[in-house]
């Protein structure tokens, strides 16, 4: 793929390692490449889960490459399919992504992690959105996704002052799923990925579709919406072979064999 991205396939799990010394910062070229990777992951029927991490133990990603910015790359440059870092604007990805945050996740690096479905982080990780101190705003999802997780006062402090949040605080606020040691990070992310593989792929796709389309609706309206037949995956999963296989495997005391149909 490129010198900046290392891809490893472990069965149905794709591991993506961002490797751009010194801080795994992302320029437009790298963002384009990441977008291609995530779109290929989306469209590959053999892949079920992706894990994104950074090389080394200090930086997950420092976000936008300020060296590229100093050389003329604009904040509103074309960062390719999927938006900045290839994931922040893919809104039809019905497979789970795990961010294995191995260190600092700043600016667009934090926004990349927020675009994932799960965040597992090392105990030395920290998170920040310092864009206001650089004369820009975290418009690749930070100022949009973070308010859905945190109270307004905490969001304001993070986006307006650039305050850093450590791993344990992020866990308390529900930003991350797990905090583990650096040595355990990838094994823990892989364990979570395998748990996701053990769930039915159509059910996962339907869940993501429902979350995505009903998150701003009142509950009563959401019920009507998901039962209206307009969704792609939800009606399919109800009449799928997997919906038969799950209860059958349970009754026969064996692991289900999912077909994704």
Curated annotation (Swiss-Prot):
<protein>
    <recommendedName>
        <fullName>Carnitinyl-CoA dehydratase</fullName>
        <ecNumber>4.2.1.149</ecNumber>
    </recommendedName>
</protein>
<dbReference type="GO" id="GO:0009437">
    <property type="term" value="P:carnitine metabolic process"/>
</dbReference>
<feature type="active site" description="Nucleophile">
    <location>
        <position position="111"/>
    </location>
</feature>
<feature type="active site" description="Proton acceptor">
    <location>
        <position position="131"/>
    </location>
</feature>
<comment type="function">
    <text>Catalyzes the reversible dehydration of L-carnitinyl-CoA to crotonobetainyl-CoA.</text>
</comment>
<dbReference type="InterPro" id="IPR001753">
    <property type="entry name" value="Enoyl-CoA_hydra/iso"/>
</dbReference>
<dbReference type="GO" id="GO:0008735">
    <property type="term" value="F:L-carnitine CoA-transferase activity"/>
</dbReference>
<dbReference type="InterPro" id="IPR022852">
    <property type="entry name" value="Carnitinyl_CoA_dehydratase"/>
</dbReference>
<keyword id="KW-0456">Lyase</keyword>
<dbReference type="Pfam" id="PF00378">
    <property type="entry name" value="ECH_1"/>
</dbReference>
<comment type="similarity">
    <text>Belongs to the enoyl-CoA hydratase/isomerase family.</text>
</comment>
<dbReference type="GO" id="GO:0006635">
    <property type="term" value="P:fatty acid beta-oxidation"/>
</dbReference>
<dbReference type="GO" id="GO:0016836">
    <property type="term" value="F:hydro-lyase activity"/>
</dbReference>
<dbReference type="InterPro" id="IPR029045">
    <property type="entry name" value="ClpP/crotonase-like_dom_sf"/>
</dbReference>
<comment type="pathway">
    <text>Amine and polyamine metabolism; carnitine metabolism.</text>
</comment>
<dbReference type="InterPro" id="IPR014748">
    <property type="entry name" value="Enoyl-CoA_hydra_C"/>
</dbReference>
<dbReference type="InterPro" id="IPR018376">
    <property type="entry name" value="Enoyl-CoA_hyd/isom_CS"/>
</dbReference>
